[in-house]
Amino acid sequence: MMRALLLAIGLGLVAALQAQEFPAVGQPLQDLLGRWYLKAMTSDPEIPGKKPESVTPLILKALEGGDLEAQITFLIDGQCQDVTLVLKKTNQPFTFTAYDGKRVVYILPSKVKDHYILYCEGELDGQEVRMAKLVGRDPENNPEALEEFKEVARAKGLNPDIVRPQQSETCSPGGN
């Protein structure tokens, strides 16, 4: 059950959505690489298990052929859980698959500079799950980006219970 929770959370961190708008094909993938901070998250249905107590920055790296690697660490139930996920490039810009094609990952820009709304759809333990995450280049909360995230979540019929995990540069069981 914990593995399924970690897989679901990890996948949700590397997907994005914004009112069905895709970035221009020419927008460089380079813009996505580097350090991102998870600012908010939600899913439908709600993923069973505990929500992360804190998260480290998400690191996106380029792999050969246009694939991406995402790395992040969560503190869940007092335990540090490292997640590394490979996103396989598709024929659509800023659209990837994960877990042998079982999940589709969209990476789309927010209207707010240096923010993305991450979105994914796919199967988890035999059930269809949709997740959205708000990430930004700095750890500070941005009310405009959060409001846009809430609007997108509402429009997609996601759980209105928005989780805002604590930011942490490193994972420390028993403290942040």
Swiss-Prot record:
CDD domains assigned: lipocalin_1_3_4_13-like
Entry keyword set: Disulfide bond, Secreted, Sensory transduction, Signal, Taste, Transport
Gene Ontology CC terms: extracellular space
Cystine connections: 80-171
InterPro entries: Calycin, Lipocalin, Lipocln_cytosolic_FA-bd_dom, von_Ebner_gland
GO biological process: sensory perception of taste
UniProt source species: Sus scrofa
Protein name: Lipocalin-1
The keyword Secreted appears for this protein: yes
Family recorded in the similarity comment: Belongs to the calycin superfamily. Lipocalin family.
Signal sequence, renumbered to the chain: 1-19
Pfam family, one: Lipocalin
